[in-house]
Amino acid sequence: MSSRTTSKAYQRGYRSGLEIKIAEQIKSCGIEVEYETERIYYVWPQRDSHYTPDFKIPTKDGGFFFVETKGRFLSADRQKHLLLKKQFPHTDIRFVFSNQNQKLYKGSKTSYAMWCEKHGFTYANKTIPDAWLNE
């Protein structure tokens, strides 16, 4: 991502261009944008940590799920989400990747999408699927 995009994102209260795009999509569906409104406290081995999901999406049954946008999906992010899943198995965290086919690292055969499937995470490419927004 260019520094210009990042600068524009910060000016609008977000950290990336993808977050701006997802916020606009949520708003266009008539859903109030809740960006980084929640913190989930979890234990990183040997230390207490917290995670702030990007977006909180309400569901029609009164529940909600979180959407985490990812351009790069680094090893530390993957480890954090595995810890969160283990410590909060009923918390619904879903990913929207800027490129779900991106490999985890140079030379890897595993894409972001494959990693999500292996570990039981719901994911999408580029935008939030309409089905998610209509739950």
State the predicted function of each range.
Residues 1-135:
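Nucleic-acid endo/exonuclease domains
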